């Protein structure tokens, strides 16, 4: 095996890439449209349903409309193997599916906008279910384009970071932006405005360079079983004996964050902070702090390498929960402890954003160009599932231990994950045995 770029990372400029790499600006636009749909079928829509007088129980049940995001790996193999009708010939497989998915998101947003959950909730549910499917599909195909556009980890880190920045901007628009518009234009106007914002992604998809893998002859069509199984078989075969350790690392990487996040808002409320305090710090201040963590990850990975960054991400992501433990022990005076609250959220948000970009980059390097959407979708689901399950038990743990020891405990969860990351680094970090088939295009 040849030595991999993990060992000798190539210096890749982060800021100048926005102007010198023709993939970056489209990635920023595509990321922004990827960040819009989720909140519009989740938290933002919950606000509309509350205004419409829908019961709390029903609103809670309707949060399950986001299930498509958890199971998107199911239909991902078909997006990897088949071209979209008509558009595939013009834009290629990846960009063609992006336009199809964006069109679906726009259409569903218009459908929701012209509904009235107070009068006909079934209409809203139907279009929201379709919006969840279209939004999850959009995530898949954008990830597929990003992964197949560039392979070396140091370049993938830059592209992933700019895509993540776009996602955060879109998420801000669909969250705080949509709520502000709803106060001024009503909910119909807010959802129509979000649909109009999706046009940014249409332009970005047309301007985005076609991945070179899209220009190669596609593999022959296969049956249903082979289409679904082929990405899993290829990934496990390529990872070889290290597959269990690598997959366990991915499953555990975000586990501390998922478990801690479930109790973060309850902690803030328990400590006496108002809704305004929480919104100001977590949404406005937290947005900029998160961008800082994203910028740092995109700049650091090309300089120190993938595995050192992965180890830092595991340690920082879990150790940051000690700041939440400190707030639980010393921040119980509400507004009087506002700056303790702000610093705590800043530390946790910065570390979370940094670790997220590192993990996205690492999972992207594990996915092959042929099965990019399928394998990345599988890895993201593997990453989310264990933490989501444990998060459901977090309230019971807090009742037994209190907030302080709970967050100390979530930070300690990261210790075995960090040891596993170090072990994987030692065993495979100096070779390219787990890297996808050689493809070092810039």
What spans do the regions from the language model cover?
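Juxtamembrane intracellular "pre-TM" segments in multi-pass secondary transporters
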Residues: 5-21, 212-246
């Amino acid at each position: 095996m040849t030595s991999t770029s993990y060992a000798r990372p190539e210096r890749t400029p982060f800021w100048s890439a926005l102007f010198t790499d023709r993939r970056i600006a489209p990635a920023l636009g595509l990321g922004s449209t990827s960040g819009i749909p989720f909140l519009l079928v989740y938290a933002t829509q919950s606000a509309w349903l509350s205004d419409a007088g829908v019961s709390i129980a029903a609103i809670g049940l309707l949060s399950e409309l986001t299930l498509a995001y958890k199971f998107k790996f199911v239909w991902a193999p078909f997006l990897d193997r088949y071209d979209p009708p008509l558009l595939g010939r013009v834009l290629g497989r990846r960009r063609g599916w992006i336009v199809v998915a964006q069109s679906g998101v726009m259409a569903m947003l218009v459908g929701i906008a012209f509904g009235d959950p107070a009068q006909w909730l079934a209409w809203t549910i139907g279009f929201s279910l379709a919006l969840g499917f279209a939004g999850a599909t959009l995530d898949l195909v954008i990830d597929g384009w990003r992964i197949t556009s560039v392979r070396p980890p140091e370049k993938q880190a830059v592209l992933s970071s700019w895509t993540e920045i776009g996602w955060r901007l879109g998420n801000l628009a669909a969250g705080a932006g949509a709520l502000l518009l709803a106060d001024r234009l009503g909910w119909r106007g807010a959802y129509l405005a979000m649909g109009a914002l999706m046009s940014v992604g249409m332009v970005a998809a047309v301007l985005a360079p076609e991945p070179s893998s899209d220009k190669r002859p596609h593999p022959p069509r296969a049956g249903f079983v082979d289409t679904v199984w082929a990405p899993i078989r290829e990934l496990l075969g390529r990872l070889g004996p290290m597959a269990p350790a690598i997959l366990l690392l991915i499953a555990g990487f975000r586990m501390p964050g998922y478990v801690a996040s479930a109790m973060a808002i309850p902690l803030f409320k328990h400590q006496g902070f108002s809704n305004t305090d929480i919104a100001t710090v977590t949404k406005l201040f937290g947005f900029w702090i998160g961008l800082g963590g994203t910028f740092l990850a995109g700049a650091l990975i090309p300089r120190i390498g993938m595995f050192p960054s992965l180890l830092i991400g595991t340690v920082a992501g879990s150790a940051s929960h000690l700041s939440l433990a400190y707030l639980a022990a010393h921040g119980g005076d509400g507004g009087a402890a506002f700056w303790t609250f702000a610093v705590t959220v800043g530390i946790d948000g910065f570390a979370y954003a940094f670790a997220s970009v590192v993990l996205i980059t690492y999972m992207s390097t594990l996915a092959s160009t042929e099965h990019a959407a399928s394998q990345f979708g599988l890895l993201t689901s593997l990453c989310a599932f264990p933490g989501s399950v444990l998060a459901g038990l977090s309230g019971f743990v807090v009742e037994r231990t209190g907030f302080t020891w709970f967050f100390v405990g979530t930070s300690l969860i990261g210790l075995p994950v960090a040891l596993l990351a170090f072990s994987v680094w030692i065993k495979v970090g100096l070779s390219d045995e787990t890297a996808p088939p050689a493809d070092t295009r810039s």
